[in-house]
A protein has these predicted regions:
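Hydrophobic alpha-helical transmembrane segments
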Residues: 2-15, 68-75, 123
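Hydrophobic, aromatic-rich transmembrane alpha-helices
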Residues: 5-37, 128-133
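Contiguous transmembrane helix-bundle modules in multi-pass membrane proteins
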Residues: 31-37, 41, 45, 54, ...
C-alpha cells in the first residue's frame, strides 16, 4: 500500500513507545492496532474484511490512510510531550531508522529506488536529526523549531508526492491528453 507520513512523524511515532508519561496500556493498545493494520496488509482474509468482503478494483488497501493517521496521532502525542525527550532518545531512534532504511536498500530488492531518492532521504534525516538535537538541547527556541520543522516537512512531502506521481506515471502509463 502507498503509505506516507514523513520521516519526522515516523520517528516521533516510534518515540511514542519510549515516552515515560504515556501509560503502558496506551502503548500496548497502539501497538495492537498497528499489528492489526500490518496483518491486514498481508493477510487476504483481513484485507477482504476491510474491503467489505469483496475484492477491490484498482484501489488495493484503500484503508491504508488509517494507518498513516494512526502514526500521525502517535507523533502528535509524542510532540506534545517533547520536553521529556532526551538526546539519547533521538540518537537511538535515528540509529534504528538508519538501520531500517539500509536494511531495506540492501536486502529489499527495490529496483525502482534511485540514488537521488536515497540521498534526499539521508539529507532530510540529517536535517531532522540536527534540528531535533538543537531543540532538545534548547539551542533554538520552540517557535523557531516549529517553523523550521514545518518548512522541512512541507518540502519533504512535496518531493515525495512528486516522486510518487512520477512512479505511478511510469507504472500505469496515464493517457496522454495531447490530441
Amino acid at each position: 500500500p502507498m503509505i506516507y507520513v514523513g520521516m519526522m512523524p515516523l520517528a516521533l511515532a516510534i518515540l511514542f513507545f519510549f515516552t515515560k508519561s504515556i501509560r503502558l496500556r496506551s502503548k500496548f493498545a497502539f501497538l495492537g492496532i498497528i499489528a492489526f493494520f500490518v496483518a491486514s496488509f498481508y493477510l487476504q482474509a483481513l484485507d477482504l474484511l476491510w474491503q467489505g468482503m469483496h475484492s477491490p478494483n484498482m484501489f488495493l488497501h484503500r484503508y491504508a490512510f488509517l494507518f498513516s493517521l494512526l502514526l500521525v496521532l502517535m507523533a502528535l502525542e509524542t510532540l506534545s510531550r517533547w520536553e521529556e525527550i532526551k538526546t539519547w532518545h533521538i540518537l537511538t531512534i535515528s540509529l534504528f531508522l538508519i538501520t531500517g532504511f539500509l536494511d531495506t536498500l540492501i536486502f529489499g530488492h527495490y529496483k525502482y529506488v534511485m540514488t537521488s531518492q536515497v540521498m534526499l532521504t539521508f539529507l532530510f534525516g540529517l536535517a531532522y536529526l540536527i534540528l531535533s538535537i538543537n531543540s532538545v538541547r534548547k539551542w533554538i527556541s520552540a517557535h523557531l523549531f516549529v517553523i523550521i520543522l514545518f518548512v522541512f516537512m512541507t518540502v519533504e512531502a512535496g518531493v515525495n508526492a512528486l516522486y510518487q506521481v512520477q512512479g505511478i506515471q511510469k507504472e500505469w502509463n496515464f493517457a496522454n491528453r495531447d490530441y
